[in-house]
Amino acid sequence: MWPQPRLPPHPAMSEKTQQGKLAAAKKKLKAYWQRKSPGIPAGANRKKKVNGSSPDTATSGGYHSPGDSATGIYGEGRASSTTLQDLESQYQELAVALDSSSAIISQLTENINSLVRTSKEEKKHEIHLVQKLGRSLFKLKNQTAEPLAPEPPAGPSKVEQLQDETNHLRKELESVGRQLQAEVENNQMLSLLNRRQEERLREQEERLHEQEERLHEQEERLCEQEERLREQEERLCEQEERLREQEERLCEQEERLREQEERLCEQEERLREQEERLREQEERLCEQEERLCEQEERLREQEERLCEQEERLCEQEERLCEQEKLPGQERLLEEVEKLLEQERRQEEQERLLERERLLDEVEELLEQERLRQQDERLWQQETLRELERLRELERLRELERMLELGWEALYEQRAEPRSGFEELNNENKSTLQLEQQVKELEKSGGAEEPRGSESAAAARPVPGAPVPQGAWMCGQAGWTPQEHPGLSGEAVGTGEAAGGAEEAACHSFRAAENRELNITII
């Protein structure tokens, strides 16, 4: 019996283990996504509650700007939302990659199984053929071993036939052996392919592990972001202290503004000097234009003279035609014509040169004017921008002074015992005026710069204008209420009514102050 060839190992077990590992990895990713699907960290709700606290709970010793804290915390919330969106996109990419890899693996396994089946069937068929050939050879050997009776030589003997059959069978065996070797090599190639696929699956599993590690790192980053949010809350408190320092710096900026105003005055003087220079240049241009006109008139006179000379030449030619009999006169005529042509050429060249020179001078003057105009426009634009900046800074400083003076007046009035309805009425009117000014500033903040300057001018007190009764008057000592002529110091209302009106005025003034601080921060 012929020895059977060794078959490659069956890849069913390895495929099952690979599919099980892929399913486990998918389950882990789904569980991770379900855990992280809400997308809101635990500390966010707590921080929103902290930010939602009313601004009226501030102490009397200092004021807190809720706009700053809200902007800082919500800014970090947006950053956390962006990280969660990145995680979602990465998870979707991983899911797509897993689906594509699983589909590719399933296709490869199906192809491998089909190839293994076909190879097994072919091997069985070839083994069956080899067995048949072996049996036939065994029979032939037995027949050749038995003694045969001599027969008459009627044709080819049986021994020769058997030898031919054996030779034919040997050739078939050799061909079958070659086919078996080729199949063995194919099986080896298939085994190599299976090994490579297993290595790829292992690499994919390693990638999945790396992605899980990245997800864990992202979780740690989210925790770090929460810690950063807490640090930002502490920074907000520090910013409040910095705002106080900025108020001191504003005083220094006022001095700088005065210096800038002096510089602007100098710039205006320079602009006036430039205007005078431009006027002088315009006068020069007018003079140059007059010169050009005079030169054109001269050229016209020269052209008229040339025409007269041509007429004279024509007359001379006629005379020469009459005197054609004389040979010497013909030579003279030719020489005269040559001289006249030379004079004409020289005059034309001189005219062309003068025209080109005049055109070059005009172009140079025009370019100089254009460059000077551009310089003047740039200078004017820069001066206008500086003036607008100075106006905005002055407007902001006046508003800050108003707020500071209002705070000082409120603290002084809360410290002193009050009795009377007149002071409360003045406080309410002052707070209403401040709220109106803040609203006007909010409206004019998104408008154009000229409108902003008009609103700032409207906010300023106009000298000589009538002041409403019960309004606040700004003086050296601070804000003082104007006396109401109708009440004349009479105490109206009880202590409870006065206390309620005072609290309402404080709340309204704090709201106006918070709005103003938000505007300055923006």
Swiss-Prot record:
Keywords, ordered alphabetically: Coiled coil
Keyword hit for Coiled coil: yes
Membrane-spanning intervals of the chain: none
Residue spans of biased composition, Pro residues class: 1-11
Coiled coil: 157-328
Matches recorded under Pfam families: GOLGA2L5
Cross-referenced InterPro entries: GOLGA6L, GOLGA_cons_dom
Segments of skewed composition (Basic and acidic residues): 439-452
Region of interest called Disordered, as start-end residue ranges on this chain: 1-77, 439-503
Record's compositionally biased regions (Low complexity): 456-471, 489-503
Keyword presence, Coiled coil: yes
Bias type Polar residues, positions: 51-62
Protein family per UniProt: Belongs to the GOLGA6 family.
The name this protein goes by in its record: Golgin subfamily A member 6-like protein 10
